[in-house]
């Protein structure tokens, strides 16, 4: 209001509002939102960023907020996801991301209970792509094949599960196509997922957001997580991503690079080409400011061709040539 201008090198930290004062007083940086909840609501605010279902949409919001880093928290995947969706769009809320189907409670009882399921768009949100998938491309593996009937219940029609089973994604797609082509009246088949780690469709890689730090603490120290979900058991509570232009590599297929985080966790970042081009966010030498580093070169799986990428290549958006 008094015409104060930030210096050119200043930047914002994009995080959920409850991190704002910590960022200000502990990190001495500028939060994009805080408990006063500036820049929080609407499709162009922090809530809109985390629930955006395309990287382009998320990147545009971050650019508007002048963000350089993004802090994600496992709570945004669990309890706070609904709050983010409502802050982003109070009319639609969680409708694009979660649905409800009904099942019998302890058959042969006729009592019906709700079974929440995730939609494909849930897995495309920025918060899931960053915190759960580390920004890497993910292909669906195991999904739930469900046959359900339309049933009248308390004056309305609801979907009630008749049959459900775990199948691989390819088999599931064929089964719903076959069933729905000749389904009896009032019967339908869908694919569903009830786990945050199991998408229903391929989730593309993020090209401009790279993991630079993760907390030593696992999310399981603070949240109840099934012991059978190995991926979530090793999920870190907090992660920090840096926004970068990314280096361009010309090629077709899938490119990958092995990475090790500051906690010693290993994962592989994969990306599928778009129009004969990859835009990659990690350097092959050195490491990120928070200690995430590559342990090998970029490799196009289909050709075996390798690429070395410097941090300057990533930060300046350069085109990189291959090594063979």
Positions of PLM-derived features:
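Extracytoplasmic
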Residues: 1-324
């Amino acid at each position: 209001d008094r015409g104060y201008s930030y210096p050119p090198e200043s930047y914002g930290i994009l995080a959920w509002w409850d991190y704002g004062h910590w960022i200000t007083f502990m990190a001495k940086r500028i939060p994009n939102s805080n408990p006063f909840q500036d820049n929080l609501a609407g499709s162009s605010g922090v809530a809109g960023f985390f629930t955006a279902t395309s990287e382009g949409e998320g990147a545009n919001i971050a650019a508007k907020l002048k963000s350089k880093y993004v802090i994600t928290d496992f709570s945004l995947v669990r309890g706070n996801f609904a709050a983010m969706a409502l802050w982003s769009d109070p009319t639609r809320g969680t409708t694009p991301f979660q649905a409800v189907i009904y099942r019998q409670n302890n058959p042969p009882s006729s009592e019906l209970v709700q079974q929440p399921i995730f939609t494909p768009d849930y897995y495309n949100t920025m918060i899931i792509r960053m915190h759960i998938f580390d920004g890497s491309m993910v292909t669906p593996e195991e999904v739930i094949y469900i046959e359900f009937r339309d049933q009248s219940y308390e004056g309305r029609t609801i979907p009630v599960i008749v049959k459900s089973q775990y199948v691989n994604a390819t088999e599931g797609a064929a089964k719903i196509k076959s069933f729905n082509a000749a389904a009896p009246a009032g019967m339908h088949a869908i694919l569903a997922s009830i786990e945050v780690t199991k998408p229903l469709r391929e989730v593309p890689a993020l090209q401009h957001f790279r993991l630079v730090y993760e907390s030593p603490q696992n999310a399981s120290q603070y949240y109840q997580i099934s012991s059978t979900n190995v991926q979530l058991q090793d999920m870190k509570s907090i992660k920090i991503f840096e926004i970068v232009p990314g280096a361009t590599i010309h090629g077709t297929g899938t490119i990958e690079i092995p990475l090790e985080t500051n906690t010693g966790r290993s994962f592989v970042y994969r990306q599928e080409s778009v129009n004969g081009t990859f835009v990659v966010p990690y350097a092959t030498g050195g490491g990120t400011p928070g200690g995430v580093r590559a342990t090998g070169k970029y490799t196009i799986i289909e050709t075996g061709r390798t690429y070395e990428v410097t941090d300057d290549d990533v930060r300046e958006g350069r085109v990189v040539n291959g090594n063979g």
